Amino acid sequence: MFGDCHIHMILDGVDYRAAFARHRTAPDEALIRRRLADYAARGVTFLRDGGDRWGVGLRAKALAGAYGIDYRSPAFNICRAGHYGAFLGRTFGDLAEYRALVAEVKALGGDFIKVMASGLMDFDHYGVLTDTPAEPELLRDLVAVAHDAGFAVMVHANGDAAVSASLAAGAESVEHGAYLHEETLHQLAESGAVWVPTLVTIGNLRHEGRFPDGVLEPLLAYQQQHVARAAALGAKLALGTDAGAYTVCHGEAVAQEYALLQEALGEKTDEILTAGETAIRRVFRPQA
């Protein structure tokens, strides 16, 4: 069984506000242990968290070894003030504030830096994103500061501009990656970064009633086609589900994501995903 290279232990796949409330006073250790036990029972031995500001991912990291799970956490995700991500992570207004957050990640024992470079896919409107991307110059600075502190960088990036800028900045992985163009797929392959496409965040919304299938079906098809093209160009891809996102349940989403990736990658699925996860494990290494 493959690991899950993108989860949010704090989220429950149903209601993020209720999920936050369970941990607002302190991480709900009993819930975390149940989820870790379920992952272990499914044969999942590697988890990479996307961070939260309540310390849930860090607590899961501390507990995971007892379940035979290698757990990596950025402590919290970091986003631009006034942009997507503040509901879950920490914000900065200038580079000095960002440097202070990176130092805090190190002090807390975080393993890498998670940066939010864009908004979400608008599941009501094909081709539309919910926020403007970070400027390329800013992303270069953010990645450089993280690298100087000894951290690899995981970037939430939707839209061709955000992904291309993240790759140019030297990010080690890009998450989601909606609406990429051919040139950026070549850039991805040449960069050596890992793409974690989280197809199940789209696939599990189909036929659910909240968003139109007339948007979801072509969006999923586009993403699968570009996953296949990226692999053909030699890009690295890894399995990650965004577990905890709406309709994406911890544990069971791993098999669901695998099935969607297999539709795109065919008989080379295991070879491609093994290489991608190996790269994630190597580059997003635990901090001493």
Placement of each model-derived feature along the sequence:
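Histidine-centered catalytic micro-motifs
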Residues: 2-12, 146, 153-158, 174
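Metal-associated gating/positioning segment near the N- to mid-region
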Residues: 2-63, 84
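Histidine/acidic-residue-rich catalytic or RNA/ligand-binding cores of hydrolases
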Residues: 13-17, 163-170, 201-213, 223, ...
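Active-site mouth loops of central-metabolism enzymes
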Residues: 16-31, 82-100, 152-154, 216
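Divalent metal-dependent hydrolysis catalytic cores, especially in the metallo-beta-lactamase
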Residues: 29-58, 68-78, 110-124, 152, ...
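Alpha-helix-loop-beta-strand connector modules within alpha/beta enzyme cores
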Residues: 61-79, 129-155, 192-200
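Metal-dependent enolase-superfamily TIM-barrel catalytic cores that perform enediolate-based chemistry
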Residues: 91-161, 167-169
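His/Asp/Glu-enriched, well-ordered alpha-helical/loop segment
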Residues: 148, 221-288
